Amino acid sequence: MRAALDAGVPAAQVYPHSAHASEAHPHEVRIAFDGDAVLFSDEAERVFQAQGLSAFQAHEHAKASQPLLAGPFKPLLAALHRLQQEGTPAIRVRTALVTARSAPAHERAIRTLMQWNIEVDEAMFLGGLPKGEFLKEFEPDFFFDDQTGHIESAAQHVPAGHVASGISNPAPSSIPSSDA
C-alpha cells in the first residue's frame, strides 16, 4: 500500500472487520473522505501534532485563503466529481468530506475544494467528535481516513480503509528502534 501511495496512486488498507455497506441506496455509490493527509496534504496536521490545537487554529486562520496542497486521494475525488458532472441514469455518485476540523479551520478546506473546482455533496466538520455515528447517517459504501482511531470508530458502522499517509503514519524505516 505504501508503495502505491509513494507512486501517486490512492491506496488504503481495508479494515476486515468493517461493517457491510448499507443496501438502502442501491442506485448510488457513496464515498466519504477525511481531509488532512487524505484529500489534502498533512501540512495542517503537522502543525496540530507539533504545537497543539491553538497553533493549528491560528495557522489555518492565517492561511485561510491559501489552498492546501493535494493529498493522495485528491485524484480519486476528482475522478468521482467528473463522473458526477457527466451524470448517468444508471447510478448516482455522492461524495462527502468528513473531517475533525471545525470553525475557523473549515474555511481553508472549503476554499481548497473551490480552488480545485470540486464539489462534495456533504461536508461534515466535526470538531474532533468521533466520526462513526455521522458516517452511519451518510451511509457511504466506503470511508477513507489516515488515523486509526477514526477508522476504528467508522468501521463499527461503515466499510472503512486506513490510508497510511502523512505525519500520523511514518514510514517503517523512520520509526525509532526500541533496541537503542
Task: Tell where the protein language model's regions lie, with residue ranges.
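Short hydrophobic/aromatic-enriched beta-strand-loop microsegments
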Residues: 10-16, 120-124, 144, 159-166
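Acidic, divalent-metal-coordinating active-site segment for phosphoryl/phosphodiester hydrolysis
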Residues: 1-7, 130-135, 146-158
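Alpha-helical substrate-recognition element adjacent to the catalytic core
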Residues: 24-27, 34-125
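Non-catalytic pre-domain segments flanking phosphatase-related domains
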Residues: 1-33, 139, 166-180
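Short acidic loop-to-helix transition motifs that present clustered carboxylates
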Residues: 19, 126-132
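Acidic di-acidic motifs
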Residues: 34, 145-146
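Internal alpha/beta domain cores that form substrate/cofactor-binding pockets in large enzymes
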Residues: 95-97, 101, 123-124, 151-180
